[in-house]
Amino acid sequence: MTVVAVVIHAGKTFGGGLEELRKVLAEAGHSKPLWYEVRKSREAPKAVRKAVKQGAKLVFVWGGDGMVQRCIDALHGSEVPIAILPAGTGNLLATSLGIPKDVAEATEIGLHGEHRTLDLGVMNGERFAAMAGTGFDAIMVNDTDSDEKEKLGRVAYLRSSLKAMRAKSVRMRIRLDGEVWFRGKASCVLIGNIGTVTGGLEVFADASPSDGELDLGVVTAKNAWQWVRVFSEMAMGRSDESHLIEKGRGKRIDVKLKRKRIYELDGGARPRTRRLKVRIEAGSITICVPTTAAP
């Protein structure tokens, strides 16, 4: 029987919690899976590597996008698939792949679903599966309290998003596949491997995590009113027509900022930097998805 491991972000929960997970796994013949609980998502890679060393052939990841990102960064390039148990707030990757926020159903997908090979983005040496960037999104992620997210869910992002709208734009130069693509001031740079952000807003309509390219968006909104317009255009599916948004696609993205800014990968904030070096890593990770998932 396949050796199964479970890596858990302690404190995160959904459905019947870990008790339900243990029950579902036991009923499927996995009464004693390799079991690891970590207090911080940054501790997850060590647990993942230990699980693989102990023979795990399938790794369940219990947590949100940040937890999944840490585990993916540790498992990339291996043949060991990840099964997502979406216990976070946003769960962007799980949602985009059709993985439900239901313990029994998500576990069933891990045990008996299809194995889909996905691309990953690599930003400053770290891999991400959903979204990464700097500016508005990074400020919002950095300023949202984890306890508030647990209590309020997506509503917790509202306060920090209002603050992010007031942040000053920064001058930058962006190269896309080696050519200068953007030069000027911008308030947000977003790089997507999938198309939808928190709140269900579609940013990149044609994005796919298996097309060998990353989608790039730059927002030049200068104040809260312009940000309201940007979000309205996204909600109406008209972001491609916006004069406040520029979009592109490619395999390599190089962002140089005039001033240091924090950045984020899959909802996890990272230290301030003046340089973002990004590339696509095609077919780098295997994820368990529903058998009806689109190719």
PLM region spans:
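Glycine-rich beta-strand-to-loop/alpha-helix junction loops that act as flexible
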Residues: 10, 62-64, 85-87, 193
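Gly/Ser/Thr-rich active-site loops/lids in small-molecule metabolic enzymes
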Residues: 148-156, 191, 199, 205-226
